Amino acid sequence: MTMFQKLVAIEPVSLIPSAEQELSRYAQQVELFADIPADDDEIVRRIGDADAVLLSYTSRIGREVIECCPKIRYIGMCCSLYSEQSANVDIAFAREKGIRVLGIRDYGDRGVVEYVLHELIGLLHGFGMPMLQDEPVEITGLKVGIVGLGVSGKMIADALAFMGAEVSYYSRSRKPEAEAAGMSYKPLDALLKDSQVVFTCLNKNVLLLGQPEFEQLGAGKVLFNTSIGPGFDSAALERWLDQPGTHFFCDTRAAAGAVAEGFFDRDNVHCQNVSAGRTKQAFVLLSQKVLANIRTVLAELE
């Protein structure tokens, strides 16, 4: 079987121990670094003469790094790859150099759904936080809007629909299967106006909510952002949170974007600062997908 000469993980990539051991089946030499490189020079030093490279979401391999490492044949992203534009690898330049780049998708979504249910139920019932209304309410009958009906957005929508919520969605394209299941498509402005709770489930670097959209959302509403980064203008978010009855939820601070100092001290901002998708099961699935990508590339090189 074709093998790489040398495979380097330039930073922690969240592989489970058995997956780390399996890397030796695919490369004659394997080197795994346990910390995040400080800069491009350190990344280049770590890669050296490796022909296969793994990285997570905490570093970037750009044109300058690729130019300095001519032996690279494969770059494996052990993190979500949504699009070339949002990737932390210069995929277009890598392609010019004949380097194969593969990422993974859909490995941490179940944890995100559980996070959403936990926080939403806590708010509706007053479990561990101030109650949204004057008395406990169920998810049943709650008007929910999902902005971005990809894999995680659809899973959140399905879970809330199962609990009895009235679910509407906005997406770049209509989703017939969602509408067949009873979910309603609405233009973004109507969804924001009509929904009591809104979830932004967008790809990285996709910003849909600005000042006009937050004005349409209005007071007395709840916003969850389950995206990796902000799906909104952060300054507009802060102004919206000055209105009565508003609440904002995110699992990590990065999901709030560039907010002012003291933002997370607000009573109506709820952030666990722990990535909800990084669970034991997610790391197993991540590892399986990373190894499958390596096998795919080696098969192409035979």
Task: Pin down the residues of each PLM region.
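A short helix->loop->beta-strand "cap" motif at the edges of active sites that frequently abuts
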Residues: 69-74, 97-99, 165, 219-221, ...
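Phosphate/diphosphate ligand-binding glycine-rich loop within oxidoreductases
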Residues: 50-131
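NAD(P)-binding Rossmann-fold cofactor-contacting core
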Residues: 162-179
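N-terminal glycine-/charge-rich "phosphate-binding" loop or analogous flexible N-terminal tail
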Residues: 1-50, 164, 168
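Glycine-rich NAD(P)-binding loop of Rossmann-like domains
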Residues: 126-156
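C-terminal helix-to-coil terminal segments
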Residues: 2, 18-22, 95, 100-112, ...
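Phosphate-coordination loops involved in phosphoryl transfer and adenosine-cofactor binding
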Residues: 4, 72, 140-143, 220
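Rossmann-like adenosine-cofactor binding region
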Residues: 48-51, 61-65, 174-262
